[in-house]
Amino acid sequence: AQAYADSIPILVLPGGVLLNQIAVKPNFSAVHNYQGIVKQVEAVYQPEDIGNAMRRAFHALRNGPGGPVVVELTADVCMKEIPDNALNYQSPPRALAQPSDSDISDAVKALRAAKRPLLWAGQGVLLGGATAELKQLAELTGIPVFCTMPGKSAMDERHPLCLGAGSGLTTMAAGKWLSECDLILALGSSLTRTFYGQPIRSNNKVLIQNTDDISAISRDESVDIALLGDTRLTLLALIDAIKDETGGSGFGDIKSTAKIIAEVKADWLKQWQPLLTSTEEPLNTYRVIHEIDKNLDHENSIVTHDAGAPRDSFVPFYTATSPHSYVGWGKTTHLGFGIPLMIGAKMANPEKFCLNLMGDAAFGMSGTDLETASRSGFAITTVLLNNGNMATYPRGFPEAGKFGVGEMQGDYAKIAEGMGAVGLTVTKASAMAPALQQARELNQSGQTVLIDVHSNMEAKKSRY
């Protein structure tokens, strides 16, 4: 379900029951039950089907919008030999498309006519390998860039034209441009409305949408110009068209725009400085995030949030720099997903320092996966905000307090040690940076680490 919500291509091969038991209750059928949460699902009913089924599966994984693909392996069929004449699998190619020249021309015309345009960078920029082209378009036009939660790290947030990223909450600079812009060029984004993303804040904006999913165009928003196709090819076409029209010089006042962004960012950080540098005990959540942001080697780290309050607090304030250095997720908001996600990140990037920030409630959902990380040798660091409560409940569920819903306790450092990891406990703000340094060193030696941070229930959110 998480892969479906976040449009992530994964292959799932569940075992199925015997053919003559498919219709017998309570046997489970992937074909019948997964329809609403996958991109494609089928079952193998005879050995001769395997090559064709796998070709269709990998075609779906490599082309069009992302999503999970399921091939159910029926039990008795999988015990049979595949006939020699059925060994016919051929790896399907990736087929790329790009918008028509007329659509590109219309988009460039609209961009040049806009007084306050905005580039909206979605996950498709990352998955399409288009981060360099996004930066080039921004610098060619002087248009600032906002990154969605799944698109966070598509643009280096230190870049003077980057406004930052947003989940349901965002930076002040992003909030300003999202409210005041008269045109949005959405790149690699479905623009689907969600509690975990920023809305299109008025109907008076020109909306240009690029996506490789035709069903996403005008799904939730009225789109003026549709750029259907691969995001990188779309960006290259836009860049070429702008260069042709301007003699290579581009348009837009980069210095003036960058100056405004810098001023708004400085004002925003000044407002938040008391919390980001707070010395209170238990530790303020934003001080924890600030220490992570200050002390990590961003280009050699991969970080992620967890569902709920950690996501809301982390996304605006962590500075993503290089592509895929931040993994933004959570449209179905599964508590605890951060730990297995970072194990996967470590498997794919063993040289990187992989860290997830989570609450104590989320740890209750997947904390035993620290044993997996420890046993497998894929050493990660988990920073756990130990505040004894599920931070969402006090605001949205006033009756929960009567029954203790969301309340919890535990020595999580000790629990981690019981599963083969190293447990560190932080009770003072001054100890946070040394703990992160120690965690990096322990990870390098192959040891998984949990940092149990005694933190507060900070309620303030970056809502602009």
Sequence positions of predicted segments:
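Conserved short loop/turn motifs at secondary-structure junctions
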Residues: 122-127, 277-278, 359-361
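A general structural motif
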Residues: 22-25, 94-106, 166-170, 283-284, ...
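Active-site diphosphate/adenylate-binding microenvironment
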Residues: 262-340, 345
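N-terminal alpha/beta PP-like core and its mobile active-site loop of ThDP/TPP-dependent enzymes
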Residues: 1-248, 252, 372, 379-382, ...
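A short, charged, Gly/Pro-tolerant segment at domain boundaries
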Residues: 70-79, 257-268, 450-461
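Thiamine diphosphate
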Residues: 180, 218-220, 226-228, 232-236, ...
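Short, surface-exposed connector motifs at secondary-structure boundaries
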Residues: 40, 112-118, 297-298, 350-354, ...
